């Protein structure tokens, strides 16, 4: 028990400085955005769906792998847990209690996310151009890159037309797939504190609370741009 407590304390102390790092802003966020991206929840996991063109320009191997597609879904997580054909208790404990290698899971999305992931929870986020660029930078920096700046392909992905890539940073108790999503939101200018955003519920609840605050006429999060439930189109 003392060992586990020590691990938790150390995790709390190091979580804010763990890769992938939040992209910090030097300007105030815009109130309205035109760049449409999606936050997707699959069970206990969350990730982003973004238009493919710009991220493929930044990471040409994505274009080589997926070709001319409208969107790509990105998720970050534990290498062993994410790629496992069978989830065991030992694998779960290892992923949670001990820093492990990470992967990026990239999925070709041929239509809008709310249609493609009809059985998942999907939210739409409207970003300004600067906020969108910052989110794409965060996603790009979530990939491990070799000395030539190339991303490294691993195994095929787990659903659809998908691929695993070697990730940047380690997965552990206080640096989970959902905290990665929170870091992405923070990088995009959303006023969210990633520290304890460790579960899918904590991410999606934040989105719902923010939407409710918008409905009441006061966001309570002055640095955030509008979120809506899909389907929704940014203006």
Report each predicted region and the residues it spans.
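C-terminal motif of bacterial Sec signal peptides marking the signal peptidase cleavage site
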Residues: 12-15
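Activation targets extended, charge/polar-rich intrinsically disordered C-terminal tails
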Residues: 17-18, 141-235
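Non-catalytic ligand/cofactor/substrate-binding and regulatory segments of enzyme domains
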Residues: 22-36, 40-43, 51-166, 234
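Residue-level signal for mature regions of secreted extracellular proteins and peptides
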Residues: 9-10, 227
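Sec-dependent signal peptide recognition
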Residues: 2-9
């Amino acid at each position: 028990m003392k060992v586990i407590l020590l691990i938790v304390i150390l995790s709390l102390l190091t979580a804010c400085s763990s890769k992938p790092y939040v992209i910090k802003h030097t300007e105030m966020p815009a109130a309205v955005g035109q760049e449409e991206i999606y936050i997707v929840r699959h069970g206990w996991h969350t990730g982003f769906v973004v238009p493919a063109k710009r991220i493929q320009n930044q990471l040409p191997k994505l274009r080589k792998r997926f070709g001319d597609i409208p969107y790509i879904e990105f998720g970050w997580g534990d290498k062993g847990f994410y790629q496992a054909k069978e989830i065991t208790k030992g694998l779960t404990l290892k992923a949670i209690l001990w820093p492990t290698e990470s992967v990026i899971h990239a999925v070709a999305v041929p239509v809008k996310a709310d249609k493609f992931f009809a059985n998942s929870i999907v939210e739409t986020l409207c970003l300004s151009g600067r906020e969108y660029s910052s989110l794409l930078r965060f996603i790009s920096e979530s990939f491990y890159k070799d000395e030539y700046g190339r991303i490294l392909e691993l195994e095929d992905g787990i659903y659809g037309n998908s691929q695993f890539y070697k990730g940047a940073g380690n997965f552990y108790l206080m640096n989970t797939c959902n905290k990665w999503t929170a870091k992405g939101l923070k990088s995009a200018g959303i006023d969210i504190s990633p520290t304890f955003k460790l579960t899918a519920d904590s991410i999606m609840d934040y989105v719902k609370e923010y939407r409710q605050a918008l409905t009441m006429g006061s966001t309570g999060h002055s640095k955030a741009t509008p979120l809506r439930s899909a389907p929704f189109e940014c203006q």
